[in-house]
């Protein structure tokens, strides 16, 4: 109820370009406030989804502390007005996520997934620290308010943006994401897809202002890599037999369009990327919840065993349909608004993007339908010896993902 009331604050309050300061180092604008609200929303739903941890009593108090620590670090990342604090909390937010994956993941491979996550992110974030020191020497400030410079250096741009490309993730530096998603518990997958990937997009929105000349010169290369990578990853989605891996790769495909929109460096592109980040956060988190609900029943994430769910839990297949249709950007979901804005931005930037964008949208629909058709239709797994229907908690959890996803499309005018 408190979160619903807080969301009403967005609808009634007029956010300008300025920050609303809470202190010298903490403040909010529309972008950071929306992502803070998304963090609170997803972290609340994470606890609701992790019923098995509370029932089994497997270090449930430690789990709650971990989630709260993660929420606090995310709040401080999004509300930080100082670049050094932003960098500090950006790195700190990795620690509770690593604990969630290694502590409550199901398979022994979770250790390897933790290594992938840490090494990719930490290796990419070291150049950013060098850039921050250089920035402080040049400007004598690390406050967002005073960063009115334009660095015309490709090397500095790569130092700064590499960590955000890894976090988003961009194609070629995305290999840690499917690994982490597949091995993470449901709470880890939800927060990773819902909020952690948005740190990459948020960082780019904040920092690209410093490199407007570099982005205008070399943006075409990164847009090309993003869109081509998104198409290749969408083809990979159609070859998956693991539900969580398919949803994880679809996240890479969606975020590639967000990256391309940001690199087009237009106002519509920024708005589209922002809308798509919020929509993708709610939609992919809901899909991971659905995959986990099936996993708890069947005991496997394989699409070959999770078949014929329409015969077993017909009421759950409605939710599968709603989330798969939202994932393919069908109306009235927020994904549609984001995709329209991003396609408008990228086509106006270069008409040659039409082919790749058309292919990306078509394949998005293809793998969403593939996921729905495979899980709901066909003959159900003959090895099932007992099966129980959905709980009210699970339907509420899915409704709390779907409702804001389709309600916020009516508030598309706050740009």
PLM ranges: what are they?
Residues 1-415:
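Core, highly hydrophobic multi-pass alpha-helical transmembrane subunits of bioenergetic inner membranes
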């Amino acid at each position: 109820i408190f979160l619903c009331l807080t969301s009403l604050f967005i609808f009634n309050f007029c956010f300008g370009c300025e920050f609303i300061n809470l202190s010298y180092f903490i403040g909010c604008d529309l972008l950071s406030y929306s992502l803070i609200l998304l963090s609170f929303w997803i972290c609340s739903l994470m606890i609701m989804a992790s019923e098995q941890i509370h029932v089994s009593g497997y270090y449930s108090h430690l789990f709650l502390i971990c989630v709260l620590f993660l929420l606090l670090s995310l709040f401080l990342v999004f509300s930080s007005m100082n670049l050094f604090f932003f960098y500090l909390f950006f790195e700190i937010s990795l620690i509770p996520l690593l604990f969630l994956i290694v502590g409550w993941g199901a398979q022994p491979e979770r250790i390897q997934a933790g290594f992938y996550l840490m090494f990719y992110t930490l290796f990419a974030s070291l150049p950013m620290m060098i850039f921050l020191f250089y920035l402080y020497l040049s400007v004598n400030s690390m406050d967002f308010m005073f960063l009115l410079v334009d660095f015309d250096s490709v090397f500095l741009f790569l130092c700064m943006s590499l960590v955000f490309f890894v976090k988003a993730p961009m194609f070629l530096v995305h290999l840690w994401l499917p690994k982490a998603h597949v091995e993470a518990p449901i709470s880890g997958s939800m927060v990773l897809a819902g909020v952690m990937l948005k740190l990459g997009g948020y960082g780019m929105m904040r920092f690209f202002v410093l490199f407007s000349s570099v982005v205008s010169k070399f943006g075409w290369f990164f847009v090309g890599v993003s869109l081509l990578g998104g198409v290749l990853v969408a083809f990979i989605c159609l070859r998956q037999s693991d539900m969580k891996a398919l949803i994880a790769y679809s996240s890479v495909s969606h975020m590639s369009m967000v990256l391309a929109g940001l690199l087009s460096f237009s106002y519509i592109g920024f708005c589209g990327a922002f809308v798509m980040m919020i929509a993708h956060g709610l939609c992919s988190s809901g899909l991971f919840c659905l995959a986990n609900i099936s996993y708890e029943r069947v005991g496997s994430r394989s699409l070959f065993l999770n078949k014929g769910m329409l015969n077993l839990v017909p009421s759950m297949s409605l939710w599968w349909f709603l989330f798969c249709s939202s994932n393919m950007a069908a109306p009235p979901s927020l994904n549609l608004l984001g995709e329209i804005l991003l396609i408008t931005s990228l086509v106006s930037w270069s008409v040659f993007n039409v082919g790749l964008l058309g292919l990306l949208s078509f394949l998005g629909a293809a793998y969403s339908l593939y996921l729905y058709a495979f899980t709901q239709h066909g003959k159900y797994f003959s090895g099932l010896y007992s099966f129980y229907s959905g709980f009210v908690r699970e339907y509420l959890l899915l409704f709390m993902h779907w409702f804001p996803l389709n309600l916020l499309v009516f508030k598309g005018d706050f740009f």
